[in-house]
Structure formats: structure tokens, C-alpha cells
Amino acid sequence: QWLKKHYPEIKILMGGGFANTELRSLSDERVFEFFDFVSLDDGELPLELIIENIESGSNTEFKRTFLLENDKVLYKNNSPRHDYKQAQVGTPDYSDLLLDQYISVIEIVNPMHRMWSDGRWNKLTMAHGCYWGKCTFCDISLDYIKVYEPIAAGILCDRMEEMIAQTGETGFHFVDEAAPPALMRELALEILRRKLAVTWWTNIRFEKSFTKDLCLLLKASGCIAVSGGLEVASDRLLQLIDKGVTVEQVAKVTRNFTEAGVMVHAYLMYGYPTQTVQETVDSLEMVRQLFEAGVLQSGFWHQFAMTAHSPVGMYPEKFGVVKDSDTIGTFANNDLTYTDTTGIDHDQFSFGLKKSLFNFMHGICLDYDLQDWFDFTIPKTTIRPDFIYEALEEETNFSVKPNAKVIWLGGKPTVESFTKTKNGSSWNRMRLTFYDKKETFEIQLSQKEGEWLVTVLDLISYSNLKTKQFQELKADFENELEDFELFWFSKPITTLKEFGLLVL
């Protein structure tokens, strides 16, 4: 409004998340009292064409753009040009912005919300769209979700280095819908190889690919936090959502991140179609147990909203809800009003869920009865009090995928050969001393095993471009020595695994 009043010659374009989801059927000409153009989906080509049209003084070719012509809102998508691939979009240029003069609004209560707004993060994307793309509450029919296109780790690190040079800031927020675990692994290795001193965080799916070792690698590369959707902590509803995870699996993944020193934030949901009162209570109990186990540090409850571009919005009858109206408005058209056939008033749970979570995040009131959070009667939970504890019971996994990558994050050991004598017999032994950032430790092996390991640690160092697979190490070991599995699960190698010998 201020710009239009004082600088009417400046053209103003709107794009991004709000436009992409809410304004796809825009027809209200009043919007154009404030904006000259509204573009949808990927913004690079639409913006380029808008600039070309402004500079040439014509209104010919556009890409997914609303504009006003003869007092009527028109949607123009008549350019034959294709959108830019993610590898071609280049690095965001922040060099002209007064980055040190923006105000930080700090949210104290929620650790993840505080991180979002306390200070500034360089924003990047690992992949366009979502590699999962199935969640039924999500706008999976729109391009920003359904068109999945990952970016190579090398290109991402090039962009990170450029942005560090521009801004002098080394913190990165990857704004992915859900960052792909395999790409996160490659990015972490590339960051370590380039010796980039960065901190970063992103959104994920709590899937089983996030093993203990992968989480340790991500932490070593500078990952400080992840946020992911637990949504409704009920296996029946997670299946209906098509989340592709179970509560038990989420618990294990959050444990892996937490033990690696990475903060975990969970998006929580209530009021999903067909959700019963019992399931809401049980969901709260699951969340309580996750905080009690110390594997969740931050969370936020969202009430389910039905959107026009989600499977629930497109096929409400499959989810036991009835759309109240099919009328399309002239402005925002995404959030839909609906009637849940269960007839449950989910609003009544809002205050109790949020109040309990507020306390859980402070590590208090975990022993309260769930009834204490509500001023109306709720049923007893059906979840066993030790459900999460049992899910987290350690199981030693002796199976390793043959094609798993083996990486050593540590440095070169100092080596000392010695002879051990007992009952008249003597053996040649080797002592390997390692110097970690925090401590010094040593392991002892037979002379031959020690020599083999010293050579191999050099080959599997994170600094090498070529990685070694588990099956390659096994074959190489058994060429010279005997049972590799016995060696791999022996006490000295188990010690190394605690200090950065990773299987990915």
C-alpha cells in the first residue's frame, strides 16, 4: 500500500507458499490494488518473463501468472519455455541486503520455534518436492510437493560456500518438505571433505533409514536439529495418513538423533478424520512417553485442516468427512470447511494438548494423570506405560548390508608393535592409539589385524572421494586373514564404532 502510494511506478510481484496453495483460482481484482502480478509454483521463469515484459512494455508471454487487463483478472500461462532444473537455478544472492539490521523475534517456550526466529539462517533446498509425496493431509497434487527433483551434494556445497562468502554467515536451514536421507548422507560427507565449518537443520520423515550411524555422520557435518511429522501418534491413523512410519519406528529414529546430539522437533496433529476421543488420549500418552524417554525435545500440536489440494480434500468420502460447500471464492481457496461424521468436537482438546506439551518441553509434569490436563472427562489411555521404553530396548544387529558404505571419521592412529608372552608362548601384537577431539583411546589387535586395519582406515577415511563397501572390506580381509564377522564384532572394533567407524 505504501509503495503503491509513494512509488506507483514500482512493479510488485507476489509468489511463494501462500499464492501456490491459496490463490490458484484468484479472480478478485482488488488484489491488484496492491500487486501487479501473482505467480504460481516455481518462481524463476515466471519472474524472468515478467521482467522481460516490463522492460519491453508488452504483455505477451507469461508463465503461470495472474495479472489485471482491462479491469479483469487474467491467468496467463502461454510461454513455451520450460522451468529451470534445480541444478540451473543458481545461488540465491543476499549480498545487497542489510542482513544485520533485521529484527529477531524470539519465541522462548518452544526450542524449535526459537531456532527458526532467533537470528538468521541462509535458506537452501536439498530437493524440490517431496520424495515420499503420499501423506493424505498434504497438498500432494501441487507441483511444489509432487515434482521431486534432488540436487547433487556437490552443487549444494558450492552454493553453501558462495552464500558464506556473501553473508559471512555459516548457519543453513534447508527448507525441504522432507529431506531425502541418502542425499543428507552425501551432503554430510561432502561438507566434511571440504572441511566446511557450518551448522544446519532441516525437515525429515522419521524413517528407518536414519540409523544410529547416519545420525552420527549428520551431527559430525554440523546438523544440529531436525523436525518431522509424528502427526497422530496412532498406528491406525498413521496408516490412514499413509505416513509410511509407525510410532515405534519414530521412537527409534528420535532416539538415534537425540543420542547423536541432534535436537528433535515433532509436528503433532489432532482431529484427523475418523479420529476417536480414545485415539486422541492415546496419542497424548505416546507423546508423554517420548518426552519421558528423553528422545523428543520439542513439539507443536496442529489441529487438522482439510485443504483443497490434499487427498482428503479431493476425496472426502474416503475419509469419513463431508465437504460443507463446493463454492469457489474469488480470493483464497484452500482451507475447506467440513463435517466429520464421527460428530466429535476436537476443539475441546486444544488447550489441554498444548498445555501438557508446554510442560513436557520443560521436563515437568510427566507423572501427571492425563485427566489433569482437561476440564472434562476423558477415557483412560489404552497404551502400556512402558510402550516407548520397550520400543527403545537395544537390540544388537549382527546383519550388515553387503553394499553398505563404511566410513572412518577419525584420524590416523599412532602405531606400536610389541610382543605379548604368556605361559611360555608369545604373540606379536599391535597397539593403535587414537586422538579424538575429546579424548585419547587405544585398541590392541594381532600384528596382522593391526596392519590390515591401519591400511583400511586410510582407505575409508571420510576425506576420500571413493568410498568402500562392507563386502569389499570383507573380501579383502579374508584374503589374508580369517573370519571377518568375528573381527568386525570384536571388542576393539566395537570401540572404534563408538568413535566414528560408521556403516551407512
Model feature map: region roles:
Residues 2-4, 51-52, 187-189, 283-290:
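Short, well-ordered amphipathic alpha-helices
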Residues 1-83:
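Glycine-rich beta-alpha loop elements in corrinoid/cobalamin-binding modules
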